[in-house]
Swiss-Prot record:
Pfam families reported for this sequence: DUF2080
InterPro entries in UniProt: DUF2080_transposon-encoded
Organism placement in taxonomy: Archaea, Methanobacteriati, Methanobacteriota, Methanomada group, Methanococci
Name this protein carries in UniProt: Uncharacterized protein MJ0362
Amino acid sequence: MKIRKKTWRLPKDATISFKGVVKPIGNSGMILIPKDYVGCKVLVTILDELGNEEFEIVETEKS
């Protein structure tokens, strides 16, 4: 994804990220996430290029 602002010469690359808390997934026979990580805060970033979208930053007046 690319972000553009009128005052920038070139658009900047950006990635999408999500904030969350790890929860246990799976059953006792096949645990997908180690127990040490359950309850920890995580940041998940999507690295695959899903599209070549470009967004423009629009500044608004603060009141």
